[in-house]
Swiss-Prot record:
Residues binding S-adenosyl-L-methionine, per UniProt: A34, G35, H36, D51, F75, D96, H103
Gene, per the UniProt record: rsmH
Protein species of origin: Thermus thermophilus (strain ATCC 27634 / DSM 579 / HB8)
Keywords of the record: Cytoplasm, Methyltransferase, rRNA processing, S-adenosyl-L-methionine, Transferase
Region entry Disordered, spans: 259-285
Name the UniProt record assigns to this protein: Ribosomal RNA small subunit methyltransferase H
Length: 285
């Protein structure tokens, strides 16, 4: 496993809103490179770190950080993971919903449309791969997936191009798919033409929106009074789910408008550009 750098997005803002207190128990629900978790530990908190990716779990365990308990699992099963540790209430929960830099930088995981790799896109080890989805899904279902989960205006044209290509030979790699999309839609000013297609497939393969809804409901339940929930979303579908949940959850919303990266952070870390942070607090009954 080669070392890679992980740049936590909205690092200071997330930790400040989490309001870490020494001795408190906090959940980093998307442990990844443990960037945010380290910040919580440095402020005296104890951290339960969840990640469904076995590689991320192995990396985090290898750090041997005092006060960090690493658990492999999906955050949609938050209550189950906490129960297994004998934990009923926590003082704060943080979720960074972005694709980990480790995933994007490792071509073998199949998340990047710029680096050749197998069409996988699974965060964990379960479920269908992106390769299975693009080679098996009927035209109408594929177009709907791209339109609804990728917010892709040319969904039908891309779906048609995918179906035409797979009739000649199976679509095997990330760059193969990216080229099919590029030829179908042509040049775009705003980013790579395959960006929204890859987003849609990743969300579908990992059932991300349903997992997020389940996580948020459980997070509100396990927070102790005064405990805080901090969520960083990276696209409008995620942010919409978080915004709606916070509005309807009964939690006290701490961010009237979402926090976004400064121009300096966005320049230093282009992947942070679309991030939106929302936070809420569980009030005493």
């Amino acid at each position: 496993m080669r070392p890679m750098t992980h740049v936590p997005v909205l690092y200071q803002e997330a930790l400040d809103l989490l309001a870490v207190r020494p001795g408190g128990v906090y959940v980093d629900a998307t442990l990844g490179g443990a960037g945010h978790a380290r910040g919580i530990l440095e402020r005296g908190g104890r951290v339960i770190g969840l990640d469904q990716d076995p590689e991320a779990v192995a990396r985090a365990k290898g750090l041997h950080l005092p006060g960090l308990t690493v658990v492999q699992g999906n955050f949609r099963h938050l209550k189950r993971h906490l129960a297994a540790l004998g934990v009923e209430r926590v003082d704060g929960i943080l979720a960074d919903l972005g694709v980990s830099s480790f995933h994007l930088d490792d071509p073998s995981r199949g998340f990047s449309y710029q680096k050749e790799g197998p069409l996988d896109m699974r965060m964990g080890l379960e479920g269908p791969t992106a390769k299975e989805v693009v080679n098996r899904l009927p035209l109408e279902a594929l177009a709907r997936l791209l339109r609804e989960l990728g917010e892709e205006p040319q969904a039908y044209r891309i779906a048609r191009a995918i179906v035409a290509a797979r009739e000649k030979a199976p679509i095997e790699t990330t760059t193969q798919l990216a080229e099919i999309v590029r030829k179908a839609v042509g040049f775009r000013r705003a980013g790579h033409p395959a960006r929204k297609t890859f987003q849609a497939l990743r969300i579908y393969v990992n059932d991300e929106l349903n997992a997020l809804k389940e996580f948020l409901e459980q997070a509100a339940e396990v927070l102790a009074p005064g405990g805080r929930l901090v969520v960083i979303a990276f696209h409008s579908l995620e942010d919409r789910v978080v915004k709606r949940f916070l509005r309807e959850s009964g939690l006290k919303v701490l961010t009237k408008k979402p926090l976004v990266p400064s121009e300096k952070e966005a320049a230093q870390n282009p992947r942070a550009r679309s991030a939106k942070l929302r936070a809420a607090e569980k009030e005493a009954p």
